[in-house]
Design a protein with these regions (language model features):
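A domain-start/cap signature at the N-terminus of enzymes
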Residues: 1-108, 147, 173-185, 195-197, ...
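Extracellular low-complexity, Gly/Ser/Thr-rich intrinsically disordered linkers
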Residues: 362-394
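Alpha/beta-hydrolase fold nucleophile elbow
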Residues: 164-176
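Hydrophobic beta-strand anchors of alpha/beta hydrolase catalytic cores
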Residues: 111-113, 229, 368
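The feature captures the conserved acid-bearing segment of alpha/beta-hydrolase catalytic domains
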Residues: 194-195, 200-362, 375-376, 398
Length: 412
């Protein structure tokens, strides 16, 4: 099958309607700068399609034998809890080694992934790539339908009692609304987290998914706990998250389109515990610069709020704003700020603009990646990039402090 053939029912009778629905969404999920046609006809688009094809194969019977066999082939066991209640249900993937005598002697990290707004667990569990990583490197993965921080804490405590969880390595990530739910948990119970990845989000928000502001006490508690943070965004997202030195209103194409291809019959948005009911938006309000304030300086102040939570040196506003006028300085022009270690990496023919910042304690506390030509959709390799960042860290149970020590299953 040619690259573009995936995306049409005429050339892909089996799953083409699903691909066409996602393609329609792609065309409304960017800020006007993306070339979607070239994306789907590129090696990057081909890998995106391969992952989506996996999702389409299993999402309608995600607990069926075919899906279970897929997970066994990855070296994993899948279980669902509270499955009778659509919004209470959650899934855990565990390495098969956990069933062996030797494996039961070990402790296992866990990665929680928060789905996007309104999505079912099934919409993202197969296409992200966490299953292959978990089977290879031996860690657990959990997907919760209710991503509110109180439910996360409840499930985490349950897993800690029932499974051989390494409580020093609890990682949380998500995309879009799932990313803002990560941030909500990050501010409320940071001491229970090792590293986080709120992806497909702006650089900083002072309030949660329900527009509840974080309190001074919560902000100070977060700073005291220190949780390393990574963000992955698309260069062409509808909300224009990059460059970070500029602000633009979210692109409105005059219509709303969903990339969902699976809807559970039990779904009822009026009962969704993660949504605002009766508000201006289903989710939290978009930050807007105050009238009369320079939008570039406002954005750098927000960046430096993020730096402050990580004990990183603030970025110089003049230097960052100057990148608006330096297109020849590609990485800084695209990202709008600078780091301590920077690179333009290439994956599947696309540029991944990447920077790292070390904090005052010499900890690689912040990593930022923006993916060329990507709309508001989890970028290819997002899971791989997050895991590469997460696995560096553990939260020492004795001191409560973050330590850089890479996870390795076979380490004695």
């Amino acid at each position: 099958m040619n690259r573009k053939d995936y995306w049409s029912p005429e050339t892909n009778p089996e799953t083409g309607e699903k691909f066409a629905r996602v393609l329609e969404y792609f065309h409304t999920a960017h800020n006007g700068s993306a070339d979607i046609d070239s994306m789907i006809d590129s090696p990057y688009g081909e890998e995106c399609a391969r992952r989506m094809q996996l999702r389409f194969k299993y999402e309608h019977d995600a607990m069926g034998e075919a899906a279970m066999e897929y997970y066994r082939a990855c070296g994993l066991k899948k279980e669902m809890y509270d499955g009778d209640d659509y919004y209470a249900r959650w899934v855990i993937l565990t390495p098969l080694e956990m069933e062996t005598e030797e494996g039961r002697k070990k402790k296992y990290p866990i990665v929680f992934y928060n789905h996007g707004g309104g999505n079912s667990i099934e919409c993202e569990e197969f296409s992200l790539g966490f299953a292959e990583l978990a089977g290879r490197d031996k860690f657990m993965v959990a997907y919760l339908q209710n991503t509110n921080w109180e439910n996360f804490e409840r499930v985490l405590d349950f897993i800690g009692e029932k499974y051989p969880l390494d409580r020093e390595r609890v990682y949380l990530c998500g995309y879009s609304q799932g990313g803002y739910q990560v941030t909500s948990t990050y501010f409320r119970i940071p001491q229970k987290l090792t590293a986080v990845g709120p992806c497909g989000n702006d650089i900083y928000r002072e309030y949660d998914n329900f527009n509840v502001p974080y309190t001074p006490e919560e902000i100070q508690n977060l700073k005291d706990a220190l949780v390393p943070l990574m963000q992955v965004v698309g260069v062409c997202e509808a909300s224009s998250f990059v460059p970070v030195n500029d602000w633009k209103p979210r692109k409105d194409w005059g219509r709303e389109c969903s990339g969902e291809t699976y809807l559970d019959d039990r779904r009822d948005d009026s009962k969704d515990p993660t949504r605002i009911h009766g508000g201006r938006r289903r989710f939290s309000d978009m930050p807007v610069p105050p009238e009369g304030e320079d939008k570039h300086e406002w954005m750098i102040r927000r960046l430096n709020m993020r730096m402050d939570t990580l004990n990183c040196e603030p970025r110089d506003a003049g230097t960052c704003i100057s990148y608006l006028n330096t297109p020849e300085d590609e990485l800084h022009h695209v990202l709008g700020f600078y780091g301590d270690k920077e690179e333009i990496a290439w994956h599947y023919g696309y540029k991944y603009y990447t920077l790292n910042i070390w904090n005052r304690d010499k900890l690689n506390a912040f990593r930022y990646v923006a993916v060329e030509n990507n709309p508001h959709w989890p970028p290819v390799l997002m899971a791989e990039l997050l895991w590469d960042f997460f696995r560096q860290f553990r939260r020492d149970s004795g001191t409560g402090r973050i330590v850089e020590e890479e996870y390795c299953y076979n380490r004695d």
